[in-house]
Each structure stands twice: as C-alpha cells, then as structure tokens.
Design a protein with these regions (language model features):
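Single conserved hydrophobic/aromatic residue that forms the stacking wall/gate
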Residues: 1-8, 12, 183-189
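Short glycine/proline-centered loop/turn elements that form peptide/ligand docking sites
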Residues: 88-89, 164-167, 184
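Helix-loop "lid/cap" segments that line or gate small-molecule binding pockets
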Residues: 22-23, 43-58, 115, 147-148
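Substrate-recognition "cap/lid" segment bordering the active-site pocket of phosphatases
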Residues: 79-82, 108-160, 165-174
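Active-site neighborhood of HAD-like aspartate-dependent phosphohydrolases
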Residues: 6-38
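Metal-dependent phosphoesterase signature
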Residues: 49-88
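Substrate-recognition element of Asp-dependent hydrolases with the DxDx(T/V) motif
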Residues: 90-116
Length: 189
C-alpha cells in the first residue's frame, strides 16, 4: 500500500476526487473526501456502488461511473499518494535479502502497475496484481493463490502485509499469516 497514516487522507483523495469527478459529470451528487474512508477497499466497482445515490446503484450506472473515472484517475492517481514512510527502504532490504515480493491490490490492474512503476522502479516484484478481468477481487483469495503459484512457495512461507480489514480477510481466506497496518484509530475500529 502506498500511503502512511499522515497521508492516508491524501491518498484517498486521489480516488475520491476521481470518483467525485465521474459522479459530477454524470449529474450525481458528490461526497466529502472523509466519507470515502468507508467506501474504499473492495475494488472500484464496489466504490462506485457505494458512492452512487440510493436507487441509482445499478450495474449500468456503475459502468457509467467507471467510464468517466478511469481516464481521469489514470492522470491523477499519484497526485497525493506516496509510499508509507520506510516502505521503500524495507522493500530494498527485502530484495537485497533475496525475499520475493509481490503486490495484490483491488485497484484496477493498469493503475496498480503505474503506481508501482512510479514509486518503486528499483524493486523487482515477482507479481503485481490489481483487479483483473475474470478474477474476483479481495477478499477472495485467488490473487494470493496466483502469487503462491508464481513464487513457488507454500502458504506457510508467506507473510501477507495489508492495511485493511479486506486484506486481513483475504489472508485468512487464503490460509496465510498476516500483519496489519491500519490508518484507523481505536475508536473507529
């Protein structure tokens, strides 16, 4: 994940501004940035469904929002996002130590790859998976199983690091050990 606790609100802003842009273009009401904290995490289609007003949450409308969102987000997905503090150094250390590193995101594939290429050009990831056509999004464990196959490792050899409940559920569904970093405060949890 690409945002530290101080920056979480800014990172959500990239998705929030892009979603608000799409909603506005389609004549729907927009949301305050803070509300997006509770809309993100299950892929962009679920984000759009949550952002659309009641009575407008059809598959057709989700696709309409997606059509407006993607070109805008492709340009603006790194406006405010930054890696978590210390993550570039940690990834470099893991790479130097010969540990395989992969990415499993619910962002769509092109955006995931663009962000990884932008922020971590010196890091070799064995796989960078975003939301892919025909593959269920997290918390479905398919993405983890795909990475296990590429890495040729067992579940017992994996440490899944995530920053959301969806990540922890994904790890549990895949049967791998997980560590959580969260931007949420205790009263929110």
């Amino acid at each position: 994940h690409l945002c530290d606790r101080r920056q979480r609100q800014m990172c959500i802003r990239d998705s929030a501004h892009s979603t608000n842009h799409a909603l506005n273009k389609l004549g729907y009401p927009t949301h305050e940035i803070e509300k997006y904290n509770f809309m993100v995490g299950n892929g962009i289609d679920k984000l759009f469904e949550r952002a659309l007003p009641e009575g407008e949450k059809s598959k057709e409308n989700v696709l309409r929002v997606r059509k407006e969102f993607v070109p805008y987000y492709d340009v603006h997905n790194a406006d405010d996002s930054r890696p978590y503090s210390g993550i570039p150094e940690l990834l470099a250390y893991l790479q130097t130590s010969g540990i395989q590193i992969a990415v499993a995101s619910n962002k769509y594939q092109a955006a995931t790859q663009k962000l990884i290429d932008h922020y971590f050009p010196e890091i070799h990831f064995i796989a960078v998976f975003g939301q892919r056509e025909g593959v269920k999004v997290k918390p479905d464990p398919t993405v983890v199983f795909d990475i296990l196959e590429i890495a040729k490792v067992t579940k017992e050899e994996v440490l899944y690091v995530g920053d959301s409940g969806v990540d922890m559920q994904t790890a549990a569904n895949a049967g791998v050990t997980a560590v959580s970093y969260t931007h949420l405060t205790l009263p929110t949890i």
